[in-house]
Amino acid sequence: MASNWDILLIQAARQGNLARVQALLSQGANVNATDGQNTTALIYAVQGGHREIVAILREFGADINKSKQPQGLSPLMLAAALNHSEILAQLIAAGANVNQVNQDGTPALMIATYKGYTAIAEQLLTAGARVNMRDRDGDTALSVAISQNYAAIVGLLLDSGVDEEIRQEAWLEALNANRPEILQLFINRGMPLDAPTLSGETPLILAVERGNLGSVQTLLQAGANPNISTEEGETALMLAAAEGYFDIVRLLLAQGASVDNQNQAGETALHLGTIEGHLEIVQALLQAGAFVNHRNHFGDTPLLIATVQGYEAIVLELLKQGAEPNLTQQGETPLTLALQRQFTKICRYLLDYGANPNAVYPDGKTVLMKACEGNNSQLVRWLIDIGADVNKLDFSGASPLMWASYHGCLDTVKVLLDGGKVNLNQKNQGGMTALMLAKFNHHQAIVSLLQQAGAIE
C-alpha cells in the first residue's frame, strides 16, 4: 500500500511540480508506488510531457517498464501514443523495452503507427522495434498503417525488414482498401503486378471486382496486363462491364484491353454489359469496336439478350450499331421474343431496323398471328404497314383474322379489315372461317363487323 509520501509524489508528478517531486524523493517516497488507478509517478510524468520529472524519476530508480494495469500500458507506449519524442528518447536511452506489449498484444510501434506518428515509428525502429510483431488479432504495424492510409509509415515499414508473408498480406489489404499511393510503394519495391495475391486473384482482377478505380489506374500505369483473366476466363473488362463500372471500362479500353475476349461460356464484355442493362458501357464497348453479333455458347447475341430483358435503349443502340435483327436462337428471333413479352416499343425498333415481319414461331404461327391473338392492334398495324402477310396460314390452316376473331380481339379485327387485303372467307383445316369462329365463341361485335365487310359462312 502506498504511504502518504508516495501519494504526494504521484500527485506532484501528475501536476508537473518538479521541486516537489525532488523533495519527496529525497525524503524517501517510493518511486515505483502506484495510486488507486494503478498508475505510477513515471506514467503520470510521461502523460503530462514533463521531461525533467521523467529524468529525475529515472535517477531515483523508477522502473521504466512498469505498466499500468489492467491495460498493460507502459511508459514507452504512452510516450509513443502521445507523440512525446523527447521523452521516448529518454526512455529508450534508459533501456526501456521497445517490444513490450499491452494486454491486447500491441507494442509501441503499432500504437505509433495507428496514430500516424512517422517520426515516433522511426525512433522505435531505430531502437530495435520488431516490425513483424502481431497483436492478438493478428494485426501488424504494416496492416495498421494501411488501414489508416499512412503512406509514409508504410514506406518506412517496408524498408525495415518486413517478412514476405506479412508483405503479401499487406499487399492484399492495400488492394482491398483501394490505397493507390500505398500500392505504388509496393510496386516501387518490386511487387509482381500479375502474380496471384493470397486471395488467388491477380491484383488487377481484385481491384476491378471492388470497383477501385484509383487502384486500377495505378496498376495499369505500372504495366499490369489489361487482358489478364480469372480461371473462368473472365477478363478485367468483362468484370467491369458486368458490374457497371463505366470509368474502369473506359480506362481498360484506353490501356489496350481486348474488347472481344470470351469467357468459358463464350460471353464477351458486350454480352455481360448487356445482361446487366448498362447502357453507357454497351455504348463504350461498341465505340471500341465490339462485335455486335457475337454468339455465346448458348447461341445468344447481345440483341437477343437485351430483347428478352426488355432493355429498350440498349436494343436501339445495338441495332444502330449493326445488330442483325433476324438471327435465330432455338427458332426464336428477337422480334418473336419481344412480342411474347409484349415489349411493343422493342418490336417497333426491330421492325424499323429490318426485322422480318413474317417471322414464324416454332409452332407455325407468324408474328402477325401472335400480335392478333394478343389484341396488340398497334403492332398489327405496324406489321401490316411494312409488309406482313395478312393471309399467311399456320400449320392448322388458320389466318391472322381467324385468330383475332376466335379470341374476340375486336380492335385487331378492325385493323385487319381496314387493310383491305384480308381473305374474309378463308377456311382452316377444320373448315371454319373467321366468321364461324367468332360466332362459335359468341363474339357478336366481331360477327357484325365481319358480316358488314362481306364475310359469309
Regions found by a protein language model. Name each.
Residues M1-T40, Y44, E181-A195:
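N-terminal segments that cap or nucleate solenoid repeat domains
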Residues Q11-G16, Y44-H50, L78-H84, I111-Y117, ...:
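Ankyrin repeat A-helix N-terminal signature
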Residues M1-Q11, G155-A177, E181-P192, L198-S199, ...:
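Ankyrin-repeat-protein effector appendages
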Residues D35, K68-Q69, N102, D135, ...:
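Ankyrin repeat boundary/linker residues
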Residues W5, N38, Q71-G72, G105, ...:
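Start-of-repeat signature of ankyrin repeats
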Residues A127-I153, D159-E164, Q168-A177, E201, ...:
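Solenoidal tandem-repeat scaffolds enriched in leucines and small polar residues
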Residues N17-L25, H50-R58, H84-I92, Y117-L125, ...:
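Ankyrin repeat structural motif
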